[in-house]
């Protein structure tokens, strides 16, 4: 069974990684985002949320 012989594993792993890097690197580097983020001046709501499990009430003593 050839998978039990670990001698060629490093060569197979490194050659596969090198091939994928050579093929995928130009594709990744040439990628341009389709939706560029825009600077929107929307009013930000600064009110905090009130969660029922974080409210401390004196009736639960």
Swiss-Prot record:
Keywords: ATP synthesis, CF(0), Hydrogen ion transport, Ion transport, Membrane, Mitochondrion, Transmembrane, Transmembrane helix, Transport. InterPro entries: ATP8_metazoa, ATPase_protein_8. One of its GO terms (biological process) is proton motive force-driven ATP synthesis. The chain crosses the membrane at residues 10-32. Signal peptide: none annotated. Subunit 8, of the mitochondrial membrane ATP synthase complex (F(1)F(0) ATP synthase or Complex V) that produces ATP from ADP in the presence of a proton gradient across the membrane which is generated by electron transport complexes of the respiratory chain. ATP synthase complex consist of a soluble F(1) head domain - the catalytic core - and a membrane F(1) domain - the membrane proton channel. These two domains are linked by a central stalk rotating inside the F(1) region and a stationary peripheral stalk. Component of the ATP synthase complex composed at least of ATP5F1A/subunit alpha, ATP5F1B/subunit beta, ATP5MC1/subunit c (homooctomer), MT-ATP6/subunit a, MT-ATP8/subunit 8, ATP5ME/subunit e, ATP5MF/subunit f, ATP5MG/subunit g, ATP5MK/subunit k, ATP5MJ/subunit j, ATP5F1C/subunit gamma, ATP5F1D/subunit delta, ATP5F1E/subunit epsilon, ATP5PF/subunit F6, ATP5PB/subunit b, ATP5PD/subunit d, ATP5PO/subunit OSCP. This is ATP synthase F(0) complex subunit 8. The lineage of its organism: Eukaryota, Metazoa, Chordata, Craniata, Vertebrata.
